[in-house]
Amino acid sequence: MEELKELRKEIDRIDEEILRLLNERAKLAKRIGEIKSKANLPIHVPEREREIFEKILRLNKEVYGGVFPQEALVHIYREIISACLSLEKKIKVAYLGPKATFTHQAALEFFGFSAHYTPCSTIRDVFVEVETKRADYGVVPVENTIEGVVNYTLDMFLESDVKIAGEIVIPITLHLLSASDSIENVEKVYSHKMALAQCRSWLEKNLPSVQVIEVESTAKACEIALEDERAGAVASEVAAYTYHLNILARNIQDSGDNFTRFLVIAKRDLKPTGSDKTSILFGVKDEPGALYKALEVFYKHGINLTKIESRPSKKKAWDYVFFVDLEGHKEEERVEKALKELKEKTQFLKVLGSYPKALLQE
């Protein structure tokens, strides 16, 4: 027991040292904010954040043996950076709402709890908030591994001049939530149609006699569950904390390989980090081999394409544009050359942005 006492004393000493260093970091962040403000420099620099994350993860693994989990380290440093940044300026983030949805969760994972968040009713509203500078950033869903692409997000890039400034990939884990503490009390289950579709087998097997009801969002389902102990909601863990609901069953989604990718949008371009993606859209003539000739450019320059998606151009029937994600930054020599050649082989080319790849997804 004496050894346990000594170890706890050592933990107390370390905690005090961590607290001292956090306050030192906060003081430095405030000084940096003052310098940036005088020089009229952007307060938030995502490229610098990426540099910090990569350095911390590398040190943890290579120098300290990786005893502390990498994913937990990302979450901790996200909040440290978010809190320090708020001492310089509170970042304003618009996202597809309502609160406690997966888009809200993605935004929190990217910007931390110290940012100021504005839920929007539609994807268009998120774009408008950023375009009009009422928000510094926006967060919108773009694709799900099971449900596919979010077409409305892609369509918005056809008409908007905002840039892609980041991506977030999160696992979609669904739980059965309720104000009751027993699953036996649940008579009705509410959720968004997509969430219900993704856990249909579990519901049929475990709650075969329960009425399943679609509502406009997982957040709405939680609001209903909060008011009625006989109601259950299918939603995220963030929703459980937000609405103070009990988690009656965890991970009830039918597929374990369910991820959603979100895009961060902004008004400015980002500098290279050394681990970037570039998103573009282009149109080609309606003739044989036109798309092949366009895509051949990337093969020629040894550039890997991670995604290609077609959408109607909305200008005339059977006229399509192509959305492409590729590895590398637009300022890299090979990417710059490829995009220059692509412009000559297409009817139009629009670079949507170059941005750091999602952390821990490489």
Curated annotation (Swiss-Prot):
InterPro entries: ACT-like_dom_sf, ACT_dom, Chor_mutase/pphenate_deHydtase, Chorismate_II_sf, CM_dom_sf, CM_II_prokaryot, Preph_deHydtase, Preph_deHydtase_CS. Residues 1-92 form the Chorismate mutase domain. The keyword Lyase applies. One of its GO terms (cellular component) is cytoplasm. It comes from the Bacteria. Its main location: cytoplasm. Keywords: Amino-acid biosynthesis, Aromatic amino acid biosynthesis, Cytoplasm, Isomerase, Lyase, Multifunctional enzyme, Phenylalanine biosynthesis. The record marks 260 as: Essential for prephenate dehydratase activity. SMART domains: CM_2 (SM00830). Substrate binds at residues 8, 25, 36, 49. It catalyses: chorismate = prephenate; prephenate + H(+) = 3-phenylpyruvate + CO2 + H2O. It is found in: Cytoplasm. Pathway: Amino-acid biosynthesis; L-phenylalanine biosynthesis; phenylpyruvate from prephenate: step 1/1; Metabolic intermediate biosynthesis; prephenate biosynthesis; prephenate from chorismate: step 1/1. Pfam families: ACT, CM_2, PDT. One of its GO terms (biological process) is L-phenylalanine biosynthetic process. Residues 93-267 form the Prephenate dehydratase domain. One of its GO terms (molecular function) is chorismate mutase activity. Its EC number is 5.4.99.5, 4.2.1.51. The keyword Membrane does not apply. Catalyzes the Claisen rearrangement of chorismate to prephenate and the decarboxylation/dehydration of prephenate to phenylpyruvate. This is Bifunctional chorismate mutase/prephenate dehydratase. It comes from Aquifex aeolicus (strain VF5). The lineage of its organism: Bacteria, Pseudomonadati, Aquificota, Aquificia, Aquificales.
